Amino acid sequence: MKKLTALFNLPELKNDIELHNMVLDSRKVKAGDLFVAIKGHQVDGNQFIDSALHSGASAVVSETELSSEHLTVAFIGNVPVVKYHQLARHLSSLADVFYDSPSKNLTLVGVTGTNGKTTISQLLAQWAELLGLRAAVMGTIGNGLFGQIVEAKNTTGSAVEIQSSLSTFKHAGADFTSIEVSSHGLAQHRVEALHFKAAIFTNLTRDHLDYHQSMENYAAAKKRLFTELDTQIKVINADDEIGYQWLTKLPDAIAVSMNADFKVGSHQWMKAINIHYHFKGADITFESSWGNGVLHSPLIGAFNVSNLLLVMTTLLSFGYPLENLLATAKSLKGVCGRMEMIQYPNKPTVIVDYAHTPDALEKALIAAREHCQGELWCIFGCGGDRDRGKRPLMAQVAEQFAEKIIVTKDNPRTEPQSQIEADIVAGFKNMEKVGIIPDRAQAIQFAIESAVENDVILIAGKGHEHYQIIGSEVVHFSDQEIALDFLK
């Protein structure tokens, strides 16, 4: 419960009001709530104030473009409406006050980068649990205490949802939380008032240019987590070109590399000296500021070696002993829809992965090749109503690294599938090894029935998702379920 006057530092109202929750969606308002009316990219919350009042809102905070109106109070009936200049920009701070600064009372780790956010945030929470902590996670797969995750709409929720969720986790006994921090979330100031014990940067490759317009804007949004927000420990992938540039400007950051010859300079550091890949993962010989050793990874692919080193480095920076981390690492498990291997006797191996950018697809195919003695198949599509420029690049990657390719539906949304396919096909030099099967289930069936035992089939793009968005409809669809049906 928070009093209206305390939240906005207002002079005493005649009748101060105790508020239960901050709510952005007028359809979810309950009696006693504060309705937050912000001007979003598509919808202006001010248009829904009447609806919120009808649902029982006890007060409203309304975004105004006039600085002269800031913190002025009007009334609709008996309900106070507080005008707030640049409300969206300051919403994280308001929610931080409303929910009593939950991130100050948690070990909070933010993870940003184009690829690897989900794997790293899930591994952080999983490893924290193995170390005896109660962990929660927020991100693409969902939000909640580890093992009790509820599906989420966006990678990074609204400023209010984040603070509210952190408060819920804290009251449920969590002492550790990992959160995926998207470029949208950073650009829109949704994590502005969070107190990060650490932040991890994975990599930066082409994605979301439909929103950011340029790679420079995209990189600048990511960088804010390390230069403008309250972040104590900065863990950077030094093998990424942007990460390496940032390290030159961040002397207090920790450098993590898979390059044995990496020159660490003045930074704290972690680097792989030798990596032995095998069917069950990898054995990573490393040296670091905290000591040397061998880390046994249960995850396949070189990029997952990088992910795991970033996670272990972060936990080492918190003071967890190296021997404890190496002992507990053996119990780590893979992440749903992230290089998830499905195998049946005498059948091709199927790998389901979320790869939906050119860089991620390349890394997934290279990782799949490690486990392929026959031909490597790649099934992929591209999302509709999204960055068209990456579609031919995805085709180029598939053609370079796979022997057999099937182009299919991803989430076409409201864009014609034929347009998406045309954009993808424009990237192929030779169509001889390419098939187009728009129906995703039929594409998976064809590959499984055509491939032989030593082949590997990478089904890319959807990962953990159990739906397809076709038009404005969301229909049930799971790559894993379809693959299992045809492997049995």
UniProtKB/Swiss-Prot annotation:
Its EC number is 6.3.2.13. Pathway: Cell wall biogenesis; peptidoglycan biosynthesis. It is an enzyme of class 6 (ligase). The keyword NAD does not apply. It catalyses: UDP-N-acetyl-alpha-D-muramoyl-L-alanyl-D-glutamate + meso-2,6-diaminopimelate + ATP = UDP-N-acetyl-alpha-D-muramoyl-L-alanyl-gamma-D-glutamyl-meso-2,6-diaminopimelate + ADP + phosphate + H(+). The modification N6-carboxylysine is found at residue 222. The keyword Metal-binding does not apply. Signal peptide: none annotated. UDP-N-acetyl-alpha-D-muramoyl-L-alanyl-D-glutamate binds at residues 24, 26, 41-43, 154-156, 182, 188, 190. Its cofactor is Mg(2+). A motif (Meso-diaminopimelate recognition motif) lies at residues 410-413. GO terms for molecular function: ATP binding; magnesium ion binding; UDP-N-acetylmuramoylalanyl-D-glutamate-2,6-diaminopimelate ligase activity. Pfam families: Mur_ligase (PF01225), Mur_ligase_C (PF02875), Mur_ligase_M (PF08245). Carboxylation is probably crucial for Mg(2+) binding and, consequently, for the gamma-phosphate positioning of ATP. Keywords: ATP-binding, Cell cycle, Cell division, Cell shape, Cell wall biogenesis/degradation, Cytoplasm, Ligase, Magnesium, Nucleotide-binding, Peptidoglycan synthesis. It is found in: Cytoplasm. ATP binds at residues 113-119. GO terms for biological process: cell division; cell wall organization; peptidoglycan biosynthetic process; regulation of cell shape. NCBIfam families: murE, PRK00139.1-1, PRK00139.1-2, PRK00139.1-4. Catalyzes the addition of meso-diaminopimelic acid to the nucleotide precursor UDP-N-acetylmuramoyl-L-alanyl-D-glutamate (UMAG) in the biosynthesis of bacterial cell-wall peptidoglycan. PANTHER family: MUR LIGASE FAMILY MEMBER (PTHR23135), UDP-N-ACETYLMURAMOYL-L-ALANYL-D-GLUTAMATE--2,6-DIAMINOPIMELATE LIGASE MURE HOMOLOG, CHLOROPLASTIC (PTHR23135:SF4). Belongs to the MurCDEF family. MurE subfamily. This is UDP-N-acetylmuramoyl-L-alanyl-D-glutamate--2,6-diaminopimelate ligase.
